[in-house]
Amino acid sequence: MTERPPSEAARSDPQLEGQDAAEARMAPPHLVLLNGVAKETSRAAPAEPPVIELGARSGAGGGPASGGGAARDLKGRDAVAAEARLRVPTTELCRPPGPAPAPAPASAPAELPGDGRMVQLSPPALAAPAGPGRALLYSLSQPLASLGSGFFGEPDAFPMFTNNNRVKRRPSPYEMEISDGPHTKVVRRIFTNSRERWRQQNVNGAFAELRKLIPTHPPDKKLSKNEILRLAMKYINFLAKLLNDQEEEGTQRAKPGKDPVVGAGGGGAGGGIPPEDLLQDVLSPNSSCGSSLDGAASPDSYTEEPTPKHTSRSLHPALLPAADGAGPR
């Protein structure tokens, strides 16, 4: 608002009458209240500002004594109070709990240009419990933040709970170490179980295949893993000895001065009997290998007893009739 000279303001303003003129004379220096607007004048001001009684507004004789400037003053104060009541204080949960700040902005508009007093307006009734309610919310949220689990943030944010002393002091089934969560333990346990199961299946499959290669008198005889290994070693040693005997007989038949009895037998590798049939007859229950396989394993079963070479060479002619006849296989 631009300022005007006193002479121009005097010409443009309407003349004050009655109580308005008296109140204008008692206004502060160089200020006149007209419709709630202060204007400059050259009149002198009284020593003290007037005190307006609130009860004079509703009195029966509220004529010239209570009208005019007093009514405008009361209207201005009512507007300021209504504006302060419309302001709703907001509660911010992100701030730490503390005493509620004093409503400083609400008291600023209470100062009027024509009056030296200040009116202290109290906040609305709903704003009073805002402070305790905020403190209650923070008191409830502090135990949740102190749990220190992976759902509330990184464990480094709570260094006082990273130690295992809390778990040792109050052990319970729902507490755990923060450094090693349940997800890591479950994954490790599943991986270990699957790896052990796969290894056991491979071992069982290998023993089953080895059991099929070992001949026994009842073909479906139940054998333990230890028995399967012992019989497999005996069977391998017997086959190696049989091959050595066949090679020796072949070399002796090729010599010119060979015994005719041994040559007539034809029990070498060059005979008419296939090697597969010979091996089956050797592993029959009547043979020495079959009886040793069905019998109990002795401590010295891992080593073969040394036998003379002529005994080994005479093994095959004795087995030939059993192969040609109807001997068991």
UniProtKB/Swiss-Prot annotation:
Key words of the record: Chromosomal rearrangement, Developmental protein, Differentiation, DNA-binding, Nucleus, Phosphoprotein, Proto-oncogene, Transcription, Transcription regulation, Ubl conjugation
One Gene Ontology term of the molecular function aspect: RNA polymerase II-specific DNA-binding transcription factor binding
Biased composition annotated in UniProt, kind: Gly residues: 58-70, 263-273
Post-translational note: Phosphorylated on serine residues. Phosphorylation of Ser-122 by MAPK is strongly stimulated by hypoxia. Ubiquitinated; subsequent to hypoxia-dependent phosphorylation of Ser-122, ubiquitination targets the protein for rapid degradation via the ubiquitin system. This process may be characteristic for microvascular endothelial cells, since it could not be observed in large vessel endothelial cells.
CDD domains per record: bHLH_TS_TAL1 (cd19706)
Primary location group: nucleus
Tissue: Erythroid and myeloid cells.
Coiled coil, from the record: none
GO BP: any one term: erythrocyte maturation
Domain bHLH: 187-239
Subcellular locations according to the entry: Nucleus
Superkingdom: Eukaryota
Assembly and binders: Efficient DNA binding requires dimerization with another bHLH protein. Forms heterodimers with TCF3. Binds to the LIM domain containing protein LMO2 and to DRG1. Can assemble in a complex with LDB1 and LMO2. Component of a TAL-1 complex composed at least of CBFA2T3, LDB1, TAL1 and TCF3. Interacts with SBNO2; this interaction inhibits TAL1 occupancy of the DCSTAMP promoter, leading to the activation of the DCSTAMP promoter by the transcription factor MITF.
Functional description taken from the UniProt entry: Implicated in the genesis of hemopoietic malignancies. It may play an important role in hemopoietic differentiation. Serves as a positive regulator of erythroid differentiation.
Family matches, as PANTHER family: T-CELL ACUTE LYMPHOCYTIC LEUKEMIA PROTEIN 1 (PTHR13864:SF16), T-CELL ACUTE LYMPHOCYTIC LEUKEMIA/STEM CELL LEUKEMIA-RELATED (PTHR13864)
Protein name: T-cell acute lymphocytic leukemia protein 1 homolog
Lineage: Eukaryota, Metazoa, Chordata, Craniata, Vertebrata
Gene name, Swiss-Prot/TrEMBL: Tal1
